[in-house]
């Protein structure tokens, strides 16, 4: 009888502890931190490293004969934690697939191979330098960062432009395109 009471107490104690353990796990997950240490006077803000810019739904008629869409999208790269004691100029070089009708125009960014839309390309301009058209593989004129300035915003604009063909060469459909950027402080 004494043994039965000990066994019952042990079973109850074990059962109660297992219920407590089950109640403790009410959700779990993993947090992964990523980043990169760079040798530069400024950091690139986290939301500005990899961006998606929605270009909208653009009428094929607005791109006929090489016309540019009026739907222009701002593109910016926010720099933070700038620590330069002297004024710096930062130049941006964009690289990607050239656009245009022959796919060789470095002043246009070609639509990606998975795009169903055809007959247009993306053009980017440098807002801080007279809206100059950006040429792939060539550094921009540069934007100034003043001594002691902690933040800076590099401003650009992107828009879709027809490749110069008639309306029947502009095929409606979805498109995407990728362009990479590299910063060079001087």
Provide a role label for each language-model segment.
Residues 2-6, 21-186:
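Mature extracellular/passenger domains of Gram-negative fimbrial/pilin and adhesin proteins
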Residues 9-16:
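Bacterial N-terminal signal peptides
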